[in-house]
Amino acid sequence: IQLPRTFEEPMGLAIDGDRMAVATKHSIVLLANEPCLAPTYPRQPGTYDALYVPRSVHFAGALAVHDMVFTDQGLVGVNTLFSCLFQLDPRHSFRPVWKPPFVSALAPEDRCHL
């Protein structure tokens, strides 16, 4: 059982089937449901029907991610600090995929607070 208090400043959440992503202060944690483990959770056997287990962590820095969604192209999130929508990038903190036309440049300035 993953409790909200075990994530540092959770702000964004995406759920799609057995996948879940949680945006925290400095990272995005990807979890997967392991329903076969839930009934045997040691502290309260027979209580739960889902158990989301952390599978990977993407260290993105303090992007202030407020919302996310799983798409056919991968996880897309709202990057409030850089005023854009983004996808995770294995080499960089993020890859911008859209910004409002009135935002002249990507900068860590929260220019429009998406």
Which role does the model predict for each range below?
Residues I1-T6, R19-Y48:
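Beta-propeller domains
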Residues L3, A38-G61, S93-L114:
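Surface-exposed loop and turn segments in beta-propeller and other repeat-based domains
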Residues E9, D16, A64, L81, ...:
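Beta-rich catalytic cores
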Residues V22-H26, F70, G77-F82:
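Conserved beta-strand positions in repeat-built beta-propeller and related beta-rich domains
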Residues I28-L30, S83-Q87:
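Structural signal for beta-propeller blades
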Residues E34-C36, D89-H92:
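Short loop/turn segments that connect beta-strands within beta-propeller blades
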